[in-house]
Amino acid sequence: MAQLFFRYGSMNSGKTIEILKVAHNYEEQNKTVAIFTSGIDDRDQVGFISSRIGLKREATPIFSDTNIFEIVANIKPKPNCVLLDESQFLEKEHVFQLAKIVDELNIPVIAYGLKNDFRNELFEGSKYLLLYADKLEEMKTICWFCAKKATMVLRVDDKGKPVYTGEQIMIGGNDHYYPVCRKCHANPPIK
């Protein structure tokens, strides 16, 4: 029985490398995967997932008008698994499409993404994945500043100063975001 998984974690928790590993494991057994990523994440190149350790792979970009269900339903042969990177950027309708892939096509879907933003508020995609996923799995990493578990994301400006207000989505990597614990989010030891 297929299920919808949401594997969430802070920045640097290994979400993208995990997608690449899962895809490799399926393909090593001659099984197919369909890989998707957000079309707004252009840090490396639209239509690719790229891990911080340098591995990169092509993926179908998702935009507002993308119908993920229709794309997957038309893939021949039917994929054995659907993998999504940057799933926090999904819209509510996209999450419903993922559930439909599981329920109607009987294909497991594994979505990876951040749970909360730099203000510690849920992203739209994460909110609906938390509500509709059959299984929730936390991917862990440590705080950038101390040894505690990182559960939040700290945004910094170009001068390295913490930012707690502003637009929810600003694409960036370690130059603007850090995985942090609750204590360091509230009072980061930045000079």
From Swiss-Prot:
Pfam families documented for this protein: TK (PF00265)
Keyword vocabulary terms for this entry: ATP-binding, Cytoplasm, DNA synthesis, Kinase, Metal-binding, Nucleotide-binding, Transferase, Zinc
Compartments in which it is found: Cytoplasm
Top-level enzyme category: transferase
Residues at the active site: 86
GO MF, any single term: thymidine kinase activity
Name assigned to this protein: Thymidine kinase
UniProt organism field: Listeria monocytogenes serotype 4b (strain F2365)
Lineage, uppermost ranks: Bacteria, Bacillati, Bacillota, Bacilli, Bacillales
